Amino acid sequence: MTKEEILALMKEKGKADALDLRSRAKDLDGTALIAEESKIPQFDPTKDYSTWAVGSPVYEIVDGERQVFTLITPHNASYYPGSTPSNTRALWSLKHTKDAAKAKPWVSPLGTSGMYDTDEVCTYNGHVWRSKKGGNPYEPGAVGTDDWWEDVGI
């Protein structure tokens, strides 16, 4: 096989994996999606997401780290110049994991999008933090958040 043929097969496999995950995504939580993160496509600001199912995942690089978002409202991204999942939370929901080994850097919730549920984790200031309560909008380690976050210390 030539390099071009191998590359074509790899692209075909990647597309098939992404479509398979997208078909199952509505039934998966953030932990399950992030476990299959390698199958999630990068957000494309020129793409028409209006035919995608609610819950379909994309990733975006936020502050140098990959963050996973799921579609809330199907739309054509090209109609919203400059929009990304991280700055259009009415259209995309930030996902989190309960797996400390796959914890993502803390990102501030916007409205209800991105709030941390019970046992979801994030990294912050070199530590892994676990949310003690659902609907957690607070920054880990901030004054007065002891009832909301546990420093796992990993």
Predicted feature residues:
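Tryptophan-rich substrate-binding surfaces of secreted polymer-degrading and adhesive proteins
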Residues: 2-154
